[in-house]
Amino acid sequence: MVQASSHAEGGHEGKQGAARSLGLLVAAVGVVYGDIGTSPLYTLKEVFTGGYGVPVNHDGVLGILSLILWSLLWVVSFKYVMFILRADNQGEGGTMALTALARRATAAYPRLRTLMVICGLIGASLFYGDSMITPAVSVLSAVEGMGLAFDGIDHWVVPISLVVLVALFLVQKHGTETIGKLFGPIMVTWFVVLGALGVHGISQSPEVLKAFNPGWAVNFFVVHPGMGVAILGAVVLALTGAEALYADMGHFGRKPIARAWFILVLPALVLNYFGQGALLLQNPEAARNPFYLLAPSWALLPLVGLATMATVIASQAVISGAFSLTRQAIQLGYIPRMQIQHTSSDEQGQIYIGAVNWTLMVGVVLLVIGFESSGALAAAYGVAVTGTMLMTTILVSAVMLLLWKWPPVLAVPLLMGFLFVDGLFFAANVPKIVQGGAFPVLAGGVLFLLMSTWKRGKQILVERIDEGALPLPLFISSIRIQPPHRVEGTAVFLTARSDAVPHALLHNMLHNQVLHSQVVLLTVVSEDQPRVPEHERFEVEAYGDGFFRVLLHFGFMDEPDVPAALKLCHLDDLDFTPMRTTYFLSRETVIASRLEGMSRWRGNLFAFLLKNANGNLRFFNLPLNRVIELGTQVEI
């Protein structure tokens, strides 16, 4: 009986584990694969009607299908799923997490480290551009299907798309926890429908399966040498969203994402692309919208509805990704602090950042109004996608060679293969800059300027403050000679440098001429890792005479809650009772000057960013009634 019971318990646990794995797989499909899953809506349409001159004939169709298939296998299956997903930063992925990893890998090489940071900022900047383009092109392409069902409705495509998109951004503040539970089942349904449509199309023209032979892709380049590289600018549309596999790894882990790709997503995508190809072999005129024309006429309206839901889910994924990327960038010091709201009491990762939300919404609305169709927007899409992919490969190269210590004889050929393919795709999209691709380049350029100015400005600000800093040991020696009046309680002074006297402490002494019985110089350290365990959160050093130095360590995914962290400082001599603790902050006002380090116009830009950034009070969750803020002017 005992043996039977243990078998029953083991079986129950096994069922629970299987159910959890299935749940994670379905959830990953809903969040991770929305973008790449909606690519069949517009990829082949853009290839054959986007002005590339690709003939809709036997060789042209098979050549393009072979290019799409082997691009999916090389870039997504091999590069991302089997390789890039292993380059996690303690389970976290994405551009900022990878930049932090590359920064650590190149710590001994300052110039190379700077280059890695620049690549990371470029990748992040292009991701924000992608976060505007994805909702616009996806929803437009879905709604355009209505034009096939109803005559004369084409002029309603833009207004309907705008209503859907604006509504999506308006609900962000309230969170998507409830409706988010439907994302997985809806996207699973979407991929099943993709596969079913593809099987139906292939059954009408099975010869399309010849495209599995990579020789057709090679043949396309041979027959169309002038068109070969250029057409990659449209083929890459089949790969949009590949970066999401890596960016969302922290939510689901590598295995559920990989399993979902190989079990459901990849087969469904390949079947659908081949089904569309089979349709084009039978009816070349279907190139105007092969996705929707692949469906029976009775299924057109339900398919438009399902496609619209799928594109909204894809849009939600990149919006959430932009929020997550912003939080990481703030913690790592690349973006000014902004107000971050949590939209779920259970999920720490579900956040809302108003400034990012409204900026994205304005960008998306302008894109829809300006471009009016998914085909026109497709030109802008490839630049952002391929640029981000290229930056990811460069960052991974540094991690692979310098942190993982892979033998160059193994690593270099592999990395050269990745860089060669990424470089080809990027080169194919460069000419598109004048055809609409300028948008992500300009948006990325502006964001890169803002992030680099903020990072450099903060460095110069700390240097200027440090120039006249009074060493802490000297200060403590002086108060031993002339002791000031001491009052009960603990004074916490936030400072970037823990071995010097903060300006706020000097100002307090100058104006109030008192010191608290306990004086804590607190430095918050942002680490190049996602989370810091509680037992590694703090370092405490006692200087005597009631002076203490405390270092608090936070990862870029941690909530920097200073009062909560200080409660962990178990030291007999140190008292952080809330009503006996006062926090002293220094508020710097920057004045741009002609001093070395930064041009005057960038100095003014940094001053503007600093003025509008969220202060330490909110960012560190300090109690409003226990904070004193003292101002100081700094020239940079």
From Swiss-Prot:
One cellular component term (GO) for this entry is: plasma membrane
Does the keyword field hold Membrane? yes
Q: Does the keyword Transmembrane helix apply?
A: yes
A Pfam family: K_trans
Which keywords belong to this entry?
Answer: Cell inner membrane, Cell membrane, Ion transport, Membrane, Potassium, Potassium transport, Symport, Transmembrane, Transmembrane helix, Transport
- S-S pairs: none
Q: Which reaction does it catalyse?
A: K(+)(in) + H(+)(in) = K(+)(out) + H(+)(out)
Q: Which residues cross the membrane?
A: 22-42, 64-84, 115-135, 150-170, 182-202, 220-240, 261-281, 293-313, 351-371, 383-403, 408-428, 433-453
Q: What is its main location?
A: membrane
- Annotated localization: Cell inner membrane
Q: Which domain of life is it from?
A: Bacteria
Q: Name one GO molecular function term.
A: potassium ion transmembrane transporter activity
Per UniProt, what is the membrane topology? Multi-pass membrane protein
Q: Which PANTHER family match?
A: LOW AFFINITY POTASSIUM TRANSPORT SYSTEM PROTEIN KUP, OSMOTIC STRESS POTASSIUM TRANSPORTER
User: To which protein family does this belong?
Assistant: Belongs to the HAK/KUP transporter (TC 2.A.72) family.
Q: What does this protein do?
A: Transport of potassium into the cell. Likely operates as a K(+):H(+) symporter.
HAMAP family this protein is in?
Kup
- Protein name as annotated: Probable potassium transport system protein Kup
The taxonomy runs: Bacteria, Pseudomonadati, Pseudomonadota, Gammaproteobacteria, Pseudomonadales
Underlying gene: kup
